[in-house]
Structure formats: structure tokens, C-alpha cells
């Protein structure tokens, strides 16, 4: 009996990035550990390379030195002539692209897992860049099922103007892993354990796939970005209101028109306008104050994946 499935090439090269942001310590801590003792991330027939992406920022325990490394992996920055005048992160991006890419080439790594923390109450989050990627939808379904009953959310950043050029985007299959809440420059054991399990399940999925296991059609719930929301500001551009207590820590929960969104110092509530229910994420994220983002609005939808199987079997 034959089944109708998509034959995918086997996965051979995997990288795990930590320290893309130097003050998000779970990935830094895990990658440093795996560089010393990588037994738990090794799988038969698979090359798995742990890697510290922004060592200078890690050393200073800061998000970045000159600019955000996780926003500059576009072909323009990757193609700039190397010189000492370039921002440190642009030079580093070119080095990373040389080691793990080149981006959009046959030689690039198959999968890059990029490990991040958020100060927002987002729990375990997988970040997806392409809603039509059967392989990653299948992987995310496997991770979500394996983590249950612990919730694991999928954040889809596929958007013509809001998608950004991530560090992991040089891989054929880019995977963002975001776990919180955790303050910048801090390690929490519970967050560490959750991220470690996410990587374990992801590598197990790849191993099963390479061994010839067929994954039947599946569906996952995802939250797709639709808009970034700035804080209310005064005429000088200063923040004029804070996240309302009713919204604080309510990532992934429905926010209805009329629900409190911001609170001013004189006690005035600013509600959500419009006529659509949204699902906020990255609520009050510390790193996004400089980006003028109080939270991101998402809409909830379902993605379907076809059956997949490794082409070697």
C-alpha cells in the first residue's frame, strides 16, 4: 500500500545558536554547556553544532554592541564590503553567513535553532517564518504534542512589512525558540528546563524523520502578526501611558475592542479600538522600548501540513 506524502531531503547539518542577544541567558548558558559536553544534542547521522552568535554582546551581557544582530541578515548587509567601519554586528553577520550559509544557497545549514528569552509572559514559543513549510509545521506539531500539557505557542511572523531578516534565516529551515518570562541578564531554572526540552523534542523529530518515519497530515494553531502597537506618546515623543494591569502578562489571551490597553499617570484608561479581537504578544517586552513597540497584535489561524517522509526511505 502506498501513501501520498511529500518526500523531503534528509536533514544533515543543524546549528543551535545562543547569544544572538547577549543578555538572553538561557541560550547562552545551554550553548556554552553543549560546547563543553554535547552528548544530549547528538543524534546518529546528524551534525549538530552549538554556536555563540554574538560573543562581544555576551561578554558585556547586553543585547548588542552596535545594532541588533537579529535584524540584519538581509542580502544588502550580508553583501557589504568588509571593513572596520562596519558595525560590529554587520561584520559578525557576514562571518556567520560564511560559516552557516551562504543564505539562499544549497550549501547553507539545513536547520538553525535560534534560542531567545523574552521578559514577556509568553511561555514556550516557536517562531515560524513561512506558513507553507510542511516540514516545520510537522516539526512544531511534534514539539507541541511532546511538551503537552505544557502549552507551546507558534508565532507566525510572515508579513510583507513586519517580517525581519533574522540570524536563523540563512538556514533552509529557520526556527526561532522564545521562552519567558525571564529578566534580561538572569537565569531561571524553569525557563532553562523548558528550552532544553524544546530542543530535545526538535532533535528527536529530526532523528525520527531521518530514520524514515512518515508523519501523517497534521494541523497546528498559530498566531500571525498583524500590527505592532507603540505606547501613547506626548508631543515630545515621551511615553505617556503604560501597559494596563489587565493586559500585563496576558500574552496569547484574547483582547477585545473596548478592553483596557494602556493606563496614563492620571488614571485614564486607553482601550483597544476597532472591531476585531486580537491576541497580544511580547507585551511590555523590555528590549522593545527602543523599538517603540508596546506589544504586537496577532490573529489566530490554523495551518495544515501534508504528510512528509524522508526521500531516502
Swiss-Prot record:
Cofactor (UniProt): Zn(2+)
Transmembrane regions: none
Entry GO MF terms: aspartoacylase activity; hydrolase activity, acting on ester bonds; metal ion binding
Binding site for N-acetyl-L-aspartate: 63, 70-71, 164, 168, 288
Protein keywords: Cytoplasm, Hydrolase, Metal-binding, Nucleus, Zinc
Coiled-coil stretches noted in the UniProt entry, renumbered to this chain: none
Chain positions of site Transition state stabilizer: 63
GO cellular component: cytosol; nucleus
Subcellular location, principal: cytoplasm
Cofactor details (free text): Binds 1 zinc ion per subunit.
Domain of life: Eukaryota
InterPro entries in alphabetical order: AspA/AstE_fam (IPR050178), Aspartoacylase (IPR016708), AstE_AspA_cat (IPR055438), Aste_AspA_hybrid_dom (IPR007036)
Active site: 178 (proton donor/acceptor)
Catalytic reaction list: an N-acyl-L-aspartate + H2O = a carboxylate + L-aspartate; N-acetyl-L-aspartate + H2O = L-aspartate + acetate
Pfam families cross-referenced by the UniProt entry: AstE_AspA_cat, AstE_AspA_hybrid
Enzyme Commission number: 3.5.1.15
Entry's localization field: Cytoplasm; Nucleus
UniProt: Zn(2+) binding residues: 21, 24, 116
Function, in words: Catalyzes the deacetylation of N-acetylaspartic acid (NAA) to produce acetate and L-aspartate. NAA occurs in high concentration in brain and its hydrolysis NAA plays a significant part in the maintenance of intact white matter. In other tissues it acts as a scavenger of NAA from body fluids.
Complex formation: Homodimer.
Protein family according to the UniProt entry: Belongs to the AspA/AstE family. Aspartoacylase subfamily.
Protein name: Aspartoacylase
Gene, per the UniProt record: ASPA
